[in-house]
């Protein structure tokens, strides 16, 4: 006899498909046949099939675990009386699962996903079967077996879910990689980071490791290969490449999104079932139905939580991979760009603004197709509830979708216009930061400030049309939410009254309202995802156009990789040879197998040019014409010629960098090193700059350091050669930067060395020492038999060359040969330069002064130890700062409009209560809202069908119209008034801070960090903040109102509110401490990536010449991995918060339904209202989290801007705001009175007790060895240094009392490094528009530039990189100085980069046109200052000698010694020509 406590059910009932049993168990159970055929067999068959495939896959992988005993537990089989097939299949599947468990354990990092999903899914099904069997007569034994099976499965699930980090052979795996399906579903692996961030400050080292997919380690080769194939096949669709590479991650989001659709659309059925249940009287089945409804709500809402988290997780992973892949492609292509390519600077916008738009757009990629499915489902479900009336809602949706589709097409167009304007502003800003020293020196900060502000205003103006379209699209998305219920319910009610049908009652009304809530979410999701996708596609197209740009140069002769170390050639050096160590071995490049880039025979020539013509632009006049030359191995070749003759272009031609050439260029494949005119340095320490991509060899390193005369500089550095040099080595002297770049080229030990005017900026003695150490008979390069090509403007030391090439002004080779051949042929070169012996200059006196920058920055960034940056968390102060920026009045208008929208939406959709604080007139409004409109309407219909239909319907429509009006007003006010105002103010504050920062600040702060403020931070403030702000504000108000309605509709639920608020407070406190730090880290880790990118752009030619492209790719990838890591973990933090809040909503749903179905003391309409609001609450909570996290991110950018503007020092001090009288200085009298100066008040002085006087009209020369303080003296006069003691007077006025900008604008300065604005020739020559065109053209003609400028387009042509050679740029600066009227002229080595003819021209112009001005000139070429009135000799920041140069030259003076060494001056040209400019 059966002992079952439940009523018996006949087997004939259980043998039907059902699925619901009938006639027993209170009709609340499945039939046994349904359970076996649906709940048991399909999951078993699917799991077994997938298990076999997985076993086959795992067999080909390697073992990942340590050897250990493996306990395999076979799944117990079960039998039933109804299905032998179930027994057989279960029996067969059991060993398959055991086999799979073994292979998964040994060959997989994670616990078996298949087994975990199967066990987790079938345990509830088996429990249901066990319950059914227990209720069957005479089946207690089988039921007990099934109950045992359920227990065993639970045990197996626990065992299979156990992770195996401790058993792995390699412990370096990321936590996510080893996490099981349950761990990943609930993000348990992320909890340690949250705990760590809660307890302590996070740094990059403390972040969780992420897998190689996120770091783009796995996909980098594939995406490069596929893109190369696409370009080669002229099928360069970037979208297709991304789909092919990341298809797995893309498809990975489909399943969880489909599951999310399923559980979301179970909600209307549940609402309808609960409302119907509450409207029915209690029966014998009520208890079972109530329990089933509670369980169903638990399953659905927990399913929503897990599916949402899984979907977002997969989406974010895909987005991060795409982000990393695109940045890699952009960087790779940048490495191939021509040095003068204008797009290389534009690419900065691509990796900042465009990438962010792509990330933002692709995050909602799956919403596009999912929303369409949800819209279709919603309309179908709505049709089942309100029949033909659903057509009205469908028409509203259709109109919104069609208009949205049409408008979204314009979105990409106007976004590109905005981005182009942003690109111009960023390029000008980056150029300004890069030339800040020259800009400050010339007093052009105000001019540049206004110029960039105007570019910002133009950018904001360009963005307005885009913002208007954005507002229109967002409004359309809300239009369907507000108007669809009005049209649907209105149509239903009218038709019901006309046809005398059942009126609108609670069950269909609230289930329909639930469906329309989901419909509104779907339409909003589609429109927003469409907007994001359009923006992403527009940015992808911009990136694609950049990647397919035909701007790559010809292949360089250099072989990629580091220098070969084969073929060691021993050499020795005598101790009297400067800079050489006799213990060092010189490694010469092995003779590589010959490969030719062009046809022709090399014979003995390493480089052969035949009829070679070269130009930088295809349609322009050739820079080089008909060049024929052969350069043999091991030779030292000097290339000379006047400025603009094409010397730099010839060197670039040898390197394969000139894009347009004709003739034959034959170069043997050799490893090459290159030194550009502008020394290219990276923001690392001194040693790393010298090593580059080479390995450290102490002996060779020391030999190179001595040869470049750097060892004495190292001795004065706070940390020796481990001292940081700052961005571009900003406070290094020109000579020090040049020698550092030269040392890098020497250390690389390349077979071919190409030098472009590298001795410029060196004082005669230091220059001669380095020159002899390299090219003397026992010089470093001579001993190594290195082929060297040196371009210079100087004719000094020509006798030491093996071969000389003389270029004419038209770019033709007018003379060439050995010094002897040129001497015998009657060369135009000076005779004495051709007959000097090569050994006569080996006794150069070493320079012994302490470098001025070492003294100045002993305690600065050069010696700083990197520390973790402070974390500034966004707080209420940041929000208040933003509100103050836009204005409190504007803010309250925005809040009132948002509140009006929510109140109107409340009454139109009838799903919330307005809070008294929402607006004024509280009493009246509260009285009107005491009963909710739809609840009131449906209850009235239940009492009196169709009564006062017009009243209810008209107010319904009014509230809908008001809602959309308020929303449109809020959006327009935000986007067109608040955002532009904030954009202008924050940018202006940043720019003003940079312009007012002291010069030393730029040596302590990485340029990438500064640039990050102007790109990423402003991008967040401009774009992310407004979208997040309006979304967060509205979602917050809706959440509060929805919660109020839920409590109002279910009194018992009010008891949970204190606990809910406490829980939310704990969650946000726990979450915020970590997420805020992650947000700051995410922004901070971008700075090294951007800095590295900018350094790469600046050194493109050098990178390719050295063959270091791969090394820099690897370094870039390292920075990218760190940036990806922090960004991905920030996304994971947001997913964790969404999951947590969804689980809280699930518990609320369970509590609400449990109270409703068990107590049943509320009306069906009230509970329906509460359930609809619960759905809205969940959706709005997600919207709040999504927008709030984005808002916090943007507020983090504002916090960074605030910190930057408040913590950056300002060079303007108290008491120096006075302005000089107009026309000051009128005389030009300069007095230094015991001046001691330093870069700031905390660093070591660079000038000590300097006293001298320059009378009006006198010409003063400042001389001395490199680093002696010459530039510091001039900088102190220009107020770039801080005068700690003494005073500097100009025309009797202490300049420390005057505005720094006024002082600089009143003086006339020709800086060592020419700089130009991003504007026309006219704007650069006459920025204040004080000269006529005739005066400008006359000045240009005086300097021989009028014809050059005319050929390039005249005064109104825009200047860009490579517009003029460096020497021509220096002449253009001189023209600017002539046009500027000032009594004092400051010259900083203005003749160092020009040939003798141009030097004579400059000297004559200075004498004839500026004879009445007081002149202070820094000079290395002492022959140019012999007619000066006075000369000052500096050493270690002190005046060691002063007097008339002609008098001192005849005495046994320091000046006479320098003058004699000046006759031995090496090739002195200027060092600051950009790599792509031709000389």
Curated annotation (Swiss-Prot):
Key word Transport present: yes
Keywords: ATP-binding, Cell membrane, Glycoprotein, Membrane, Nucleotide-binding, Repeat, Transmembrane, Transmembrane helix, Transport
Glycosylation site list: 183, 234, 345, 427, 611, 628, 793, 797, 1161, 1187
Organism listed in the record: Aspergillus rugulosus (Emericella rugulosa)
Domain of life (superkingdom): Eukaryota
Protein location: Cell membrane
Descriptive protein name: ABC transporter ecdL
Segments of this protein annotated with the region Disordered: 1460-1479
Topology versus the membrane: Multi-pass membrane protein
Transmembrane spans: 32-52, 82-102, 142-162, 251-271, 291-311, 365-382, 391-411, 469-489, 503-523, 885-905, 955-975, 1028-1048, 1052-1072, 1135-1155, 1165-1185
Function of the protein: ABC transporter; part of the gene cluster that mediates the biosynthesis of echinocandin B, a fungal lipidated cyclic hexapeptide that acts as an antifungal agent.
Domain ABC transporter: from-to ranges: 607-835, 1230-1461
Listed GO CC annotations: plasma membrane
